[in-house]
Amino acid sequence: MSSKSGLFLPLSSVITSYNENTNLSLKTIDAFLGFLVVVGGLQFGYALLVGTYPFNSFLSGFISCVGQFVITVGFRMALTQQELQSSSSKKKSPVVSPYKRAFLEFCFSSLVLHFFAVNFLG
């Protein structure tokens, strides 16, 4: 019994720390990242089981999931970095908020990614 609790103690410690120290917006982004992993995994599993007959469709969908995952990780990193910088120093605020800039970059890059994904469908 004690060996099982010894195995799960670090995991429960990480989960507790994550729940206490992570704000809601980052948790929402993490949930979206999990969703993208599940959707990409389902698409890849479907391609393995059934086949990739419309290969453009498979590539477009799978690469769209992977690309959106990468873009979202970059967005999360930008938000985390801005939180660390804002808590450590009090600099003069720029014209555009770093949070707004990160969100606009996320939106623009997502639009470009999905524009190319839809065009690749043929």
Swiss-Prot record:
Localisation: Endoplasmic reticulum membrane
Pathway recorded for this protein: Protein modification; protein glycosylation
Bilayer topology annotation: Multi-pass membrane protein
Annotated Gene Ontology cellular component terms: cytosol; nucleus; oligosaccharyltransferase complex
Segments on the Cytoplasmic side according to the record's topology features: 1-30, 76-101
Keyword Endoplasmic reticulum: yes
Keyword hit for Zinc: no
Transmembrane parts of this sequence: 31-51, 55-75, 102-122
Residues in the Lumenal compartment per record: 52-54
Example of a GO biological process term: protein N-linked glycosylation
Free-text function comment from the UniProt entry: Subunit of the oligosaccharyl transferase (OST) complex that catalyzes the initial transfer of a defined glycan (Glc(3)Man(9)GlcNAc(2) in eukaryotes) from the lipid carrier dolichol-pyrophosphate to an asparagine residue within an Asn-X-Ser/Thr consensus motif in nascent polypeptide chains, the first step in protein N-glycosylation. N-glycosylation occurs cotranslationally and the complex associates with the Sec61 complex at the channel-forming translocon complex that mediates protein translocation across the endoplasmic reticulum (ER). All subunits are required for a maximal enzyme activity.
Assembly description: Component of the oligosaccharyltransferase (OST) complex.
Similarity section: Belongs to the DAD/OST2 family.
Name the UniProt record assigns to this protein: Probable dolichyl-diphosphooligosaccharide--protein glycosyltransferase subunit ost2
